[in-house]
Amino acid sequence: MTREEAIKKIIFAMDVKEFSDVQYWAELLSQHVGMFKVGKQLYTACGPAAVRMIQKCGGEVFLDLKYHDIPNTVAMATLEAANLGVQLCDLHAMGGYEMMNKTMEALDKNFSGCTPRPKVLAITVLTSSNEETLRGIGIELPVPEMVVKLAKLAKSAGVDGVVASPQEVELIREACGKDFLVVTPGVRPSFASADDQKRIMTPAEAVKAGADYLVIGRPIAAAQSPVEAAQKIVDEIVAG
């Protein structure tokens, strides 16, 4: 794998709340990561302006708002995300088949022809969760089995891929095929701590397992030199 290919796999989690920080990180890392993730805190604080600033700096955007509501509401919200020109957005697989399918139908209807639409990802089981967490909400399945069940449901609804722990990537590949996108948080380079993620791998391990994109935040943002940290992650991926 080339360095350019490795860079494109990295999604930097822009976990900030100040608009000035958006420009700072976008300008600093636009040549060193493949995409920027805008989550709930940043989007609530700054709104679409955060997305536009990243785009102005030449960056691509994963709008990580994890929609989970009645089908029509999620479909309309996803259309608005698509109209912002983001590359990735997501919804919760636990919202069910109808919610996911109606969303994909709305996107395909509104983005037919030459206009590209964003790829839509379904959230499976959050990487901060384990089997005790699932039991607490009445789910008795083991985490890997639940993840695969949700991934297969998402694929049947027409969703482009899933967000899942790197530990479940190979199982998802077996169940859903090589063309189904898998985006993995819970990735920690060899030089970083695990923080609050419970099901983790190194970048090289996750890519080897078949991950298409790696979501990485604190190991880059908290480093003394964020650019150097991003470059080290690229080195790890290339080295395999």
Curated annotation (Swiss-Prot):
A single GO cellular-component term on record: cytosol
Q: Which gene encodes it?
A: pyrF
The catalytic residues are: 66 (proton donor)
* Record flagged with keyword Nucleotidyltransferase: no
Q: What does this protein do?
A: Catalyzes the decarboxylation of orotidine 5'-monophosphate (OMP) to uridine 5'-monophosphate (UMP).
Under which name does UniProt file this protein? Orotidine 5'-phosphate decarboxylase
**What's this protein's family per the entry?**
Belongs to the OMP decarboxylase family. Type 1 subfamily.
Gene Ontology biological process terms in this record: 'de novo' pyrimidine nucleobase biosynthetic process; 'de novo' UMP biosynthetic process
GO molecular function term, any single one:
orotidine-5'-phosphate decarboxylase activity
Output the Pfam families linked to this UniProt entry: OMPdecase (PF00215)
Q: Which SUPFAM superfamilies match?
A: Ribulose-phoshate binding barrel
**Which InterPro entries would you find in this protein's record?**
Aldolase_TIM, OMPdecase, OMPdecase_AS, OMPdecase_bac, OMPdeCOase_dom, RibuloseP-bd_barrel
Quaternary structure and partners: Homodimer.
EC number(s) on record?
Answer: 4.1.1.23
UniProt keyword Lyase, yes or no = yes
* Binding residue positions for substrate: 15, 37, 64-73, 127, 188, 197, 217-218
